[in-house]
Amino acid sequence: TWSTTKLAKEVSPDSIELLSDVIALVRPGSMDAGMTDEYIRRRNGKTWKKKHPIYEKIMESTYGVMVYQEQVMDVIHRVAGLPYTTADKIRKIIAKKHDVKLFAPFKKQFIEGCLEKKTLSEKEAKEFWEALQAHGKYSFNKSHATEYAIIGYWCAYVKYYYPTEFICANLIHGSETKKEELIEEAKRLGLTLI
């Protein structure tokens, strides 16, 4: 998509892991919570206030930004001390795009858990919870994002090194609604159309 291409240019991914982050960040939950812009700033060298060593360790590979469902589960378990069964219930709410009101019963447990473990202040716990609710609109799990990243990488490789074959295969096997767009792309690439 246009938004994925734009974000990839801003992030300049040089690994499948970073490309997976790009795929996961172009989701409504991440974008609505401002996580995408924050990720770009941090990837480009902006420093940030560290929340807690456990939290930062979980978010280390994503520059302190919560990107994946697995990170959400780890924070819920390791920062608030809630069991993985509870974290998994929250993950299911995230995965199924349920109404954020379904998060309400878990908010108090999370904040109390953070205070009891002395991992996050009440204010920080509430801020995290707000970010978590934004994730409820839709986010990927890491394996799903990685799968899309690998497919995207392969497609980009074939398009770059074998543009005729790429366009031809997509015209034959691709979506009917994309054919006009593919013909324009073929012209842009200087390919001869018969």
Q: Can you say where each PLM-predicted feature lies in the sequence?
A:
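Noncatalytic, beta-rich nucleic-acid-contacting surfaces in large DNA/RNA-processing enzymes
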Residues: 2-194
